[in-house]
Amino acid sequence: YDILSDNEIETLLTKSDLELDTSNESHKPILHGVSGRVIKARTLNQRKIIDSVMKNDMVFAIGPAGTGKTYTGIALAVKALKNKNVKKIILTRPAIEAGENLGFLPGDLKDKLDPYMQPLYDSLKDMIPAEKLKKYLEDEVIQIAPLAFMRGRTLDHAFVILDEGQNTTHSEMKMFLTRMGKNTKFIITGDPG
């Protein structure tokens, strides 16, 4: 820890000289959505995410809102699950917008957090038929949880996406990055702006 300076980290995160192999998987469809729509990289940066995930176990996808970072990551996770490369998908976000007012909302914790986690559910609904998605969620093959729930876990045989990583504290990010176990892929998305 604390081996790289802030400037070195910034340089590594903003580097744009990643070589793309045009013959690789980044140009092919990732998968077919429930409506039959082909889900594939639509931009150079989405292809970079695919290429990076194929070469690395941990990828930081940094860019403005609405550029497909999370959607591309979730599509890659669903593909890995379908191909039996992983046993589960874990999607997480820091629940900062939910703040301390959760206790005043009606329902259990899931009811309180679901609106904040809705963008993740929306992406999954595009890619997995409703009944199968329901079963995956019930069986915890797909888990959607706030970042605080990752503490103390070791995540093996999983595809894990931390969405909205810019909203984490230093200690939350450190805690998350140390959860990686065997045969696990991590994608951390964020918007530095």
Feature locations, PLM:
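Conserved RecA-like ASCE ATPase "motif II neighborhood" in helicase/translocase motors
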Residues: 140-161, 165-175
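Conserved P-loop
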Residues: 62, 71-139
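Conserved P-loop NTPase nucleotide-binding/switch module
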Residues: 95, 100-106, 168, 172-193
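Interdomain "pre-motor" coupling segment immediately N-terminal to P-loop NTPase/helicase cores
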Residues: 1-26
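Pre-Walker A adenine-sensing motif
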Residues: 40-55
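Loop/turn-to-beta-strand initiation segments
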Residues: 87, 139-142, 156-159, 183-188
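Pre-Walker A (Motif I) flank of P-loop NTPase domains
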Residues: 55-61, 87, 157
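Conserved glycine(s) of the Walker
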Residues: 68
